UniProtKB/Swiss-Prot annotation:
It is a multi-pass membrane protein. Keywords: Chloroplast, Membrane, Plastid, Plastid inner membrane, Protein transport, Transmembrane, Transmembrane helix, Transport. GO terms for cellular component: chloroplast inner membrane. Part of the Tic complex. The lineage of its organism: Eukaryota, Viridiplantae, Streptophyta, Embryophyta, Tracheophyta. Involved in protein precursor import into chloroplasts. May be part of an intermediate translocation complex acting as a protein-conducting channel at the inner envelope. This is Protein TIC 214. Residues 253-277, 1513-1526 have a biased composition (Basic and acidic residues). Its main location: plastid. The chain crosses the membrane at residues 25-45, 70-90, 95-115, 132-152, 180-200, 223-243. The keyword Transport applies. GO terms for biological process: protein transport. It is found in: Plastid, Chloroplast inner membrane.
Amino acid sequence: MNINNYSITLILLIKSNLVSSCMKIINSVVVVGLYYGFFTTFSIGPSYFFLLRARVLEVGDEKEISATTIGFIAGQLMMFISIYYAPLHLALRKPHTITALVLPYLLFHFFWNNHKNFFDSVYTTGNSMRNLNIQCIFLNSLIFQLFNHFILPSSTLARLINIYMFRYNNKMLFVASSFVGWLVGHIFFMKWVELVLFWIRQNHLIRSNKYLVSELKNSMSRIFSILLFIVCIYYLGRMPSPLVTKKLKKTSKREERGKNKEETDVEIEKISEEKGTNEQQEGSAEEDPSLCSEEKEGLDKIDETEEIQVNLNGREKTKDEFNKEKYSKNSPVCENYDLDGNQDNFELKKKEKEKKNIFWFEKPLVTLLFDYKRWNRPLRYIKNDFFENAVRNEMSQYFFYTCQSDGKQKISFTYLPSLSTFLEMIQQKMLLCITEKRSYEESYNNWVYTNDEKKKNLSNELFNRIAVLDKGFLVTDVLEKRTRLCNYENEQECLPKIYDPLLNGPYRGTIKELYSRSSMNEYLIPSIEDPRDTIWINKLYDIFPTDFKELKKKKIGKRINEIKKKVFQWSYKLIDDLEEEEEEEETTEDRGIRSRKAKRVVIFNDNETTKNNASNRDQVDEVALISYSQQSDFRRDIIKGSMRAQRRKTVTWKLFQTRVHSPLFLDRIDKIFVLSFDIDRILNFIFRNWMVEVTEFKIMDSEEQKAKKKDKKKKENERITIAETWDTVLFAQTIRGCILVIQSILRKLIVLPSLIIAKNIGHMLVFKPTEWHEDFEELNKEIHVKCTYNGVQLSENEFPKNWLTDGIQIKILFPFCLKSRHRSKLQPEDSLKKKGKKQNFYFLTVWGMEAELPFGSPRKGPSFFETIWKQLKKKHKKVKVKSFVAVKIIKERTKWFGKVSNEKTKWVTKKVQFIKKIMKELTKRNSISLFELKKVSESNSNRNKTEKFSIISNKMIPEFAIRIRSIDWTNYSLTEKKMKDMADRINTIRNQIEKITKDKKSIFLTTTTDRNIRPNKTSWDDKRLEQSKIFWQIVKRGRAKIIRKCNFFFHFCIEKICIDIFLSIINIPSRNIQILFQQKKKINDKYSYNDETKKNPIHFISTIKRSIYKTTNTSNKSQILCDLSFLSQAYVFYKLSQIQVSNKYNLKSLFQYHGTIPFIKDKIKIFFGTQGIFNSESRHKNFHDFGMNEWQSWLMGNDQYQYNLSQTCWSGLVPQKWRNRINKNLANSSNFYFYEKEPLIHYEKEKNYAVNSLPSRREKLKNYKYDLLSNKYINYENNSSSSFYGLPLEVNQAHAILYNYNTYNSEVFDLSGDIDFRNYLREDYDIDRDQNSDRKYLDWRTFNFCLRKKRNIAEWTNIDIGTSTTITKKIKSQIHYYQIIDKLEKNKTDNKGFLNLAIYKQIDSANQTKVFFDWMGMNEEILNWSILNRELWFFPEFLLLYDAYKIQPWIIPLNLLLLKLNINEKQKGDLHISYNKNKSLDLENRNQEETQQPVRGDLGSYVQKENNPGSDPLKKQTDGKEDFDRSNIQRNINKKKSKSNIAAELDFFLKKYFLFQLRWDNSFSEKIINNIKIYCLLLRLKNPKEIAISSIQRDEMSMDVMLVPKATTFIKLRKRRLLLIEPARLSINWDGLFIMYQTLVILQVHNSKYQTCKKKINVDNKGLIESMARHEILFRNRDKNNYDFLIPENLLSSRRRRELRIQICLNLRNFKVGDRNREFSNENSTRSCDLFFYEDKNLDVDIKKILKFKFFLWPNYRLEDLACMNRYWFDTNNGSRFSMSRIHMYPY
């Protein structure tokens, strides 16, 4: 086995090493370079033309091919080198390089190749390559390779360069490997080209067509010239000519200065958003993120820039047109700012250096030819708010710079640009100073040394303060105070915190500048006692100038040095169309920016004349909107004179194409059904016929709706396309407008009147009445209204402004329709209602037709002839009806005659056929004489008289004829003999057959003879036949009845079978439960001892159905019999949980610890010794008595602050506000006394054992005995309550053991009554409600308020489990008794009601004491009970749990099941909630009563009647708390007396828990949304839906006002599910609240699973006790020897405390100077923060100092400090990236 294990581990190691090595190889520089170089092969440039031309045409000349290839490779090598070498990169990537070099070279090469016959129509086939020498070929390939790629340009690859160059240190290796990768790809490409050429040469079709080959060879030079010409045009499009560009007007200096005065000061240094304060600026300015330079060559190419001048006096001034100044506001004034004292000499040296520059002419020449300030590149115009002119878009978000951090030189990607600029200026001016550079080791050691010194100083200071505290000094004298800025020492009038410069953190704020005299008087001179002093003050203001803005900046800033930085900026001020329209003054300047194509749509015109001044013309007020074009805008925000950006990613193939997109998004567009692979649609199409008819109709309806939507969308797109097409074509709007006007005139004056005339003339010809008046009256109703291009109507006579250029629409109101006949005016109302509303307007089209929408498809109007055709159809129908009878009679007569004639013809044909047949037979046979026939018959008749009739019947009729022809006597004898023989033979055969049949039918012949003899009498056979007939008739009738009733019969049988099966299943538990109870009783009797306490497990809900018959309660101890057939499964699980089995393994983990045995009592030692758990030797050893240490208790069990709060309240605390309050209380307190030992606050520790699944329950049952034993000795010295702080140094008297399955008490909704924390809870406190967190909250998702009336709703929020049990000294055994009481309404109770049975309940009619057992409030009166028949359920008791399950689906801690409340409802309806104490009974008394109980129903617990209610020994101790809780609950209930129970219940929850939201149904929303909109319009509010919900929630908006019935209330709306209560799906605030909560959760990790035994260590806590003496005054009723402990590090200030923690956590000596990258460092070598806790498990046993140090180190790992370290060290402030598990010891 060991060999196999070793082999498996070896294989795993080899595999892991292979995987890691493969990952390293893949991420290496060489592999990435090869990958990048291989993909650059697909980027094809113009040099490939020369390469392919040489391969195709110059097959024989190897030198020229090699020269082309070498030049091609050399050019690509230069491109790769330019990646690494910056000067070459700048030379090749200058903006004018391609314009100055590439275009002339391409044009020269193009014309030079074709100079001989460029204008000829026929090109020569001579090889132009032979005219060039090898050098020219090499240069062509080299130079063309440097040009930009135009096929598959490598923009993505260029971005990859920047990524990998920043990632890897060995850049040259990356360049070399990328070149090798490109070379490999190039070789593959050339091989592929050779294979293609070889295939072309070997192809028989091409070789056979010699003419095609010759033409191809002759035209190769022409093809090459054309391609080269296309490349030239392509580059000309990319880079326009620098000389022919549109010049723009520059802004004047006066405008610049005037506008600069209006600009506000720019604060460049960013303010920290977390603290919200302005930190001190260090004389440097941080530029806007958009001002960071992306390309450093921009500093050299731009001469006209703006200079940001950071002066130290705090104001901004304008130097000239291109220079601006920025100042840091809070920096002190420094007049003599000279770093090296030789600034003048530095300026002289700089000028001399510029004179020595040889290429001084380069900059003016480039500026002259290529003016970068012209808008000749497709750049966006980006306007900056800080500057009036636009800043070039050449900035980056990050700024990289090297800095020294942690004693090492590092690269920071968020370095302040202002600091780097300032540092560069200092380095330039410090020419004389020579600084020595230290090595990395030396600088790092120096940094470590300084940090060690800081740590030692802080540690010594802390130890000194602790030593002073131990000597007995007060805490106020030892604590480090904050330094404040005060006026006088005695008065101690300090500045406000917001203005105090010595404070930091949240106290700091911005100081507002004072400008007016009133504000200066208010701040500088807050109170003036003598009013005469104000006069002198005013005089002082008049003498001295106070308006500092008017002072000239030159006088102030003469001796102030400036920090300047060049900023890319344009010298033009450009505006677009919108800005031009917004300008109040008319500007003569042209718009410089091309705006998006739009139109001004006038919505409203108001023509009003001014009555006051008649000379003024009409004032036209227009309300207009801007309508943008639907087509793609390729010139938006582009400066006039610049070229369009080439959109390589979008494809347009239509004149007008909506939603232009890239081919990458083809999957988003609508697909064709044939080409798409939509599985749902295909399956729907295939299996459509297999569906049910109803679903088929639904599918058809949905498909029809989809088809309609699709058609509507298609028509809308077509309409927009037509509109945009008209708007795109030049002069199209003018032509269209004129055509529309002409069509309107023709329609109104010519077309329609001519139609009316023609119609009436036709009526006259047909002798019908004419309708001249009606037609012309309808024609006059038609109105043609002029509209804008978008269909906004203006008036009938007014044309829209600029309608010839913008377009026009003509709207026809009440359009005329020519009718053949006008109907009468008096029409019935029903016919008018059936018609419905008809659209009374249309838009005129270009073709004179009508459309419903502008540019819509023309409609099909009612036709004139259609009505005539309908009338003709009606007349035709009338004629048909009249002639229908005659036609019917004629048809019937013709049918009858046809039938008769057919019958006659058939009869005649039959007769004819019969005669013909007879004739044929006569001709065939010879006739026989009558004599012969007679003779034969006589001879035959003599044989047998009985056969007479058969012979005669069988004679042949055709032979009865007489022969006419002559007889041949010679042959006649032979034929006659033969005939006679045949006749004899036939007769014999017939006779035999007749005999056989005669024998068979003899019986029937006799019956017939009898009948003939007795015809009046019926025989027996006839009677039997009649009886059988009657029987079968009866059978048929019964069969019909059975067929009718079989369906009901089958149903009856099935129900009978199902009922039998269900009854048998239900009776299974009743047959088996007795066995379980007997076994349980045996086990309990076996393990019960008089000196041992029995367990008190948690009872599951066990509701048993009451027997149907009534039980009479004659005495107090009468029993209620129960029917065990309705036993719940939960009760079975409960009884199984009580089975006691001694398992040593469960206690193994507890007793492995060597310090366990001294804590165990002698009785328990003896018991476990008999079980073999303990060794007998260790039982009698006496060890030193250990106790629980206060510090250790506080460290291991307590949360951060010692207050009685739940985790919900802790998560809602504001940390800073809390700490300030606590520190203030500590600092201001001066009375410290300590007389009694009692806890600071009774804190009830929480531990949530959630019963969420069956395995979890089994695990709890498995560790049941272990938890019981450990709980006994954890709380060995504790009182009745399980307060964690009740762990004294002295040993109290031993009490009985209480085990409530958990070792603590908990509250469902922890509303702390000890301290009011409402001031410390944030209002916007929210948590993520979708997750099932550890915090207990009310789940509103499935809460059904209408399901039941909750009497104990107030107590749900304050369930107290701690007082649910009581203990006495005499009791050695204790048990809880629970019952469930669900009372139905009196009018609803009957024999079928489900009443929960109290197990072994003893009812005291006079004074009844009950112990309740409640699961999330099931002891309630159920109002809305379902109508279902619950007899068919297996376990009807589970129906009672259904609603409780919906509220909290089996995720409830077990300790929440106990609810000790007794609710008594008075007749007046007032609720009185009282507590019932658990009655502890002696084991002997219980055993005595146990003998008196019947055997049946031995299921649970007893409740003993107690005559004396005050017999409980601990009742007096709990009276105070009970009264307090009862008064609070009663106070909350009394407030709601005026409301109903449900309303009071809802208000109670809404006041305390606001973490929910209301949501209404769509139907309900539609009803009231109109009313809400009216309110919103009146109140000028937004978001009507949110306002409605919040208003309803705060009762600000009454539901009676809405469009719903007045009787509708909030409860009814919830019942009808119109208003739904949902959990508030809010996001988590990643702030101090979350950090505080996470801190508390992390601290509970070691205590959440199991409690371990505690030890006593004697520690001197004299000073600590004295410092905490003041708290005993606040809490006197607590247990003794419970303390609150001061954290030693709190003696220091918060800043010093954080500094000390960081110094401790740094562990500087373990640092490595090398690389910190995770991929190259060993992660196992880093030590995590938990080494202080887990490195040695026996630290708390050895010495006191280690324990003190461990307690002292505990706060160092709080999450809030680590968050600060994460923010400032790792430069990430996003909370989502912060994880406690990923933070290790620094460095990270």
